[in-house]
Amino acid sequence: MLICGENTNPLARYTLMAQGEQIHISSYPPVWPTRPASQAGGYDLEQAIRIRAGAHSFEAKVFNVVASACLDKAMLDRIADVLGRAVLADIEQAPRGVSVVIGPTGLPVSEVVSGEEKILYCDIDLAECVEPKQFHDVVGYYNRFDVFRLEVDRSSNRPVTFLAPPYREYGKEADRRPMTAADQARELETEGFHLIDA
């Protein structure tokens, strides 16, 4: 599953393809007004969704379940109350997101829903992903693994890493290695603090 603009990221999409996804889920907001309705060149959310969803389905040979949120009357009334009628007018005139299921050929295999809250039903057959992969399997035979490689780091990212002071001696030479919890405890104790287990 990728959210909104993440579906534009080819590395994220390829990572999912390489893990063998057969059904991709794309979620989008109900509307994305990037300019006032009076200005040309605004972002066409509906068209962008159709292009991205179709491209991913075709490249990955997967079904893509696209789910866009919906703005109901209560939300529109609240926007008008908080942000004003001018902002509401821009939102009402902006292209809406769409909900649809796209098949492995890149074409819709369900009805297209836009601007209303509705449950979308669609029967899919995963066997339909097989033949298209015989033509272009970009995570298999139809790739140049001798030239291209994608590396994904699944390690957890720490919110903070404490580094030792730059000239502190650890062994034979000065080292700016990350401080372990034990290093931090020793440093606190040398400064007169004592750690107590709770």
Residue ranges and their predicted role:
Residues 17-18, 77-78, 83-84, 126-129, ...:
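Short, charged/polar low-complexity linear motifs in solvent-exposed/disordered segments
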Residues 116-136:
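A short, polar/charged loop-to-alpha-helix boundary motif
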